[in-house]
UniProtKB/Swiss-Prot annotation:
Transmembrane segments: none annotated. It is found in: Cytoplasm. GO terms for biological process: tRNA methylation; tRNA nucleoside ribose methylation. The gene is trm44. It catalyses: uridine(44) in tRNA(Ser) + S-adenosyl-L-methionine = 2'-O-methyluridine(44) in tRNA(Ser) + S-adenosyl-L-homocysteine + H(+). Its EC number is 2.1.1.211. Probable adenosyl-L-methionine (AdoMet)-dependent tRNA (uracil-O(2)-)-methyltransferase. One of its GO terms (molecular function) is tRNA (uridine) methyltransferase activity. This is tRNA (uracil-O(2)-)-methyltransferase.
Length: 505
């Protein structure tokens, strides 16, 4: 892709677009930057629609946009949305040489509603009038009009201008064109450096995505496939406002509190909305978090009324704060427990010979859970490949978020490259592909979601539906197919003994 090197236009440059008006004062749309491009009008419109629907691409202060009105959708569905319900909606401006093609109204949702409120904005898509059959220029225009009347009303995440215009010009005969950005300033508005930088940034996003499409780029990562984005983000915002500050201020681990708190709040929000789809709001079978680490996710979910517990081979300082007494069908227990997993497929033969003394059976969990218990495996490392296997044994739905690559023996290893050559060949991509295949072999429909969490290890694999003849699945055969368990028992014995030593000290 050619480097982004825009031409900065002079303050007195000739306007790229002219707004028609019946009054004396013509709105002055001032061009700021222009760049040559090789992406056509179809790509330009696709890119602009994507940016309209996903404003977070341009601003990290924004979560998303909720589309409140769309003439194309309304026409297709025969619907009439009363604009009177949307407050003060700007009149549709006319531009010389252009006809209105589509009108959308979006609500910009900020990440922090404590800092700024959502803002409605009209987005207008225009096309040039007349025929281009003789090789004339094709012109397309996209206008953003915030629903505010003064600079003081403008939220922090939006440039303080009355309007933003993106203009695309294309020559079919030369198969090349240009794209530019213009501002409609408030009255008496100047051209401060900050607004100029923002204009360059906005144009760069259009150029980058447009040229990427023209060069054959295809998006690999798709979000919000299992649960709608707005539901997860609304729940996340509510959780953040309820818990984030207190959790960060009371952090006792040596790790970065902000990363862990916000990441687990995101995962909790996703799980809460996923569980709403699976179970409704009146029933929840409980959950178990295998390899629960600091126990924060278990703590948040319990606070929200979703009862469950977690275990890990090593206890954490934070457990003293997060662990609570939990009523279960088998009695009252701690919500966070120090246990080592010894799954049913791992033979216990010879345990007396290798354990000698100091092996405590009560520190071992066999990985069997009550039917229907939702299994959480969040960066569970050694337990990650076991997750779909344990789920199949106990008939439990699950979510698995892989991180570090381990085989079924618990040893570190590099998973084989994906068979699908279109997928990346990285260690993480290989791990995700490998555990996804285990999931499918265990009779689960492997649904995948790219979580919006502050981590590059953000792929979630959800197993909530069975497929094929589940009764014909032989877990032992599957375990052997993926490398077997040689050495796992010895690792468990060492972990249990180290746990004993920790308790003595």
């Amino acid at each position: 892709m050619p480097k982004f090197t825009p031409e900065e236009l002079a303050v007195n440059a000739v306007p790229v677009i002219r707004q028609a008006t019946s009054g004396d004062a013509e709105p002055d749309w001032r061009p700021l930057f222009r760049h040559e491009c090789t992406f056509n009008p179809v790509i330009f419109q696709d890119v602009m629609l994507n940016l309209i629907k996903n404003p977070n691409i341009n601003s990290s202060w924004l979560f998303r946009a909720d589309i409140l009105y769309d003439t194309e959708k309304n026409i297709q569905n025969g619907l009439e949305t009363p604009l009177s319900e949307l407050g003060d909606v700007p009149d549709i401006p006319s531009f010389d040489g252009f006809g209105l093609h589509r009108r959308l109204i979006r609500r910009l949702i900020p990440r922090s509603t404590m800092r700024d409120k959502p803002m409605d904005q009209t987005c207008l898509i225009y096309q040039s009038k007349g025929s281009d059959s003789e090789g004339g220029l094709q012109r397309h225009l996209v206008i953003y009009l915030p629903h505010v009347s003064t600079e003081a009303e403008m939220p922090y995440y939006h440039p303080t201008v009355r309007g933003i215009a993106f203009h695309h010009e294309w020559s079919p005969t030369e198969t090349r064109g240009s794209v530019s950005v213009s501002y409609l300033y408030f009255e008496g508005g100047e051209r401060p450096e900050k607004l100029t930088r923002i204009a360059s940034h906005l144009l760069q996003a259009v150029y980058k995505h447009g040229q990427g499409r023209a060069d054959g780029y295809q998006k690999r990562v798709h979000h919000d496939l299992l649960v709608p984005q707005d539901r997860v983000q609304n729940t996340y915002t509510a959780l953040k406002q309820k818990y984030a500050r207190a959790l960060i201020e009371s952090w006792v681990e040596s790790t970065d509190p902000t990363k862990h708190v916000f990441e687990d709040l995101c995962i909790a929000a996703f799980l809460i909305e996923l569980w709403t789809d699976i179970y409704g709001r009146n029933f929840f079978p409980g959950f178990v978090d295998i390899g629960c680490g600091n126990g924060l996710l278990v703590h948040i979910l319990n606070l929200e009324g979703f009862k469950g517990w977690g275990f890990d081979a090593r206890s954490r300082k934070s457990w003293a704060t997060y662990s609570t007494r939990l009523e279960t069908p088998t009695g009252v227990q701690e919500s966070l427990q120090q246990l080592v997993l010894l799954p049913p497929p791992v033979s216990r033969a010879g345990i007396s010979e290798i354990s000698s003394e100091g092996f405590r059976e009560e520190l071992v969990h066999d990985g069997r859970f009550p039917k229907g218990t939702f299994i959480i495996s969040n960066h569970a490392d050694e337990l990650t490949p076991w997750t779909p296997i344990l789920a199949a044994i106990s008939d439990c739905p699950f979510i698995m978020i892989p991180c570090c690559s381990h085989d079924l023996t618990g040893a570190r290893f590099r998973a084989p490259a994906p068979k699908d050559k279109k997928k990346a060949n990285s260690a993480y991509s290989s791990l995700v592909s490998w555990v996804t295949q285990i999931t499918a072999d265990c009779g689960w429909v492997a649904e995948q979601e790219m979580l919006r969490i502050p981590s590059t290890r953000n792929t979630a694999i959800v197993g909530r539906k069975r497929q094929g003849d589940v009764s014909a699945i032989d877990i032992g055969v599957i375990v052997d197919r993926y490398g077997g368990t040689a050495g796992y028992l010895e690792t468990v014995v060492k972990l249990v003994k180290s746990t004993n030593l920790d308790e003595k000290h």
